């Protein structure tokens, strides 16, 4: 019985977060709140786009993939970026169970389009997040 109750609590778990830009709700004027899939998508993007040493009290947070964009874009570089993303999400976003990470190089714009497909235990369908990694000077 306790196992069934625990399972139902896990299935009903709701994740909430504030959007990065802290925009107000157009009708109520309150801060918008992201929930469930949207909250986890934002968290995944935050982890991927954060470089090491950007967080003062947690210097190992992030994936540090933006530094790899200054390397020559070869299949080995794409593989390294994919593995860095997979490792950082495994360490810093335990709610996301990574199913697939695909990269597509865009040499003309010096960018890399990353598609991350993951699932969440409490949500029935998989979620996809697209992140465009660009070189910033």
Q: Positions of the model-derived regions?
A:
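Immediate N-terminus of the mature polypeptide
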Residues: 1-82, 87, 99, 104-137
């Amino acid at each position: 019985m306790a196992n069934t109750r625990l399972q139902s609590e896990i299935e009903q778990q709701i994740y909430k977060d504030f959007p990065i830009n802290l925009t107000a709700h157009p009708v109520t004027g309150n801060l918008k709140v992201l929930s469930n899939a949207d909250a986890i998508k934002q968290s995944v993007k935050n982890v991927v786009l954060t470089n090491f040493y950007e967080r003062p009290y947690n210097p190992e947070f992030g994936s540090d993939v933006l530094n790899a964009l200054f390397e020559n874009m070869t299949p080995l570089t794409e593989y390294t970026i994919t593995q860095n993303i997979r490792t950082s999400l495994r360490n810093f976003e335990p709610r996301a169970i990574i199913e697939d990470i695909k990269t597509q190089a865009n040499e003309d714009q010096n960018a890399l389009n990353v598609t991350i497909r993951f699932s969440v235990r409490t949500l029935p369908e998989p979620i996809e997040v697209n992140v465009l990694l660009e070189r910033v000077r």
